[in-house]
Curated annotation (Swiss-Prot):
Alphabetic keyword roster: Ribonucleoprotein, Ribosomal protein
Protein name (database record): Large ribosomal subunit protein bL19
Keyword Nucleus found: no
Function summary: This protein is located at the 30S-50S ribosomal subunit interface and may play a role in the structure and function of the aminoacyl-tRNA binding site.
Gene3D superfamilies: 2.30.30.790
Disulfide bond sites: none
C-alpha cells in the first residue's frame, strides 16, 4: 500500500523516454562522466543480462568483454547519469536472467538474433 504522494513523485521522476529492450539485447548506453570541471559522454555497449522492473527503482545489468576481461555494469534505468540508450540488436533468449553467460567465453557466449 503506497501513498498517493509517493506515487505522484515517482511518476514525475519517470518521465525519461526509455526504448523497449529485454535480456539478450545488445544496447549502447551513453553515460555522463564528469572529469574535473568538464563533462563528457562515455558509451557502454554490451548485452543485457538482467532487468529489474520496479518503477523508479528499475535497473538493468549490461555485460561486455573489454580487452579479454568481462565487465558488468548495473544501471538505474531512470538515473540522470544516463544520457541515452539505443538498442543495436535484438537477442533471442528464453531466460530472464542470463547469468550463465559469465561462465561462457568466445563463440559459446554468442546470442542468436531475433528474426521477427
Amino acid at each position: 500500500m503506497t501513498n498517493k504522494i509517493i506515487l505522484a513523485l515517482e511518476a514525475e521522476q519517470m518521465t525519461k523516454e526509455i526504448p523497449a529492450f529485454a535480456p539478450g539485447d545488445t544496447i549502447v548506453v551513453q553515460v555522463k562522466v564528469k572529469e574535473g570541471d568538464r563533462s563528457r559522454l562515455q558509451a557502454f555497449e554490451g548485452v543485457v543480462i538482467a532487468k529489474r522492473n520496479r518503477g523508479v527503482n528499475s535497473a538493468f545489468t549490461v555485460r561486455k568483454i573489454s580487452n579479454g576481461v568481462g565487465v558488468e555494469r548495473t544501471f538505474q534505468t531512470y538515473s540522470p547519469q544516463i544520457d541515452s540508450m539505443a538498442v543495436k540488436r535484438r537477442g533471442d533468449v528464453r531466460k530472464a536472467k542470463l547469468y550463465y553467460l559469465r561462465d561462457l567465453s568466445g563463440k559459446a557466449a554468442r546470442i542468436k538474433e531475433k528474426l521477427a
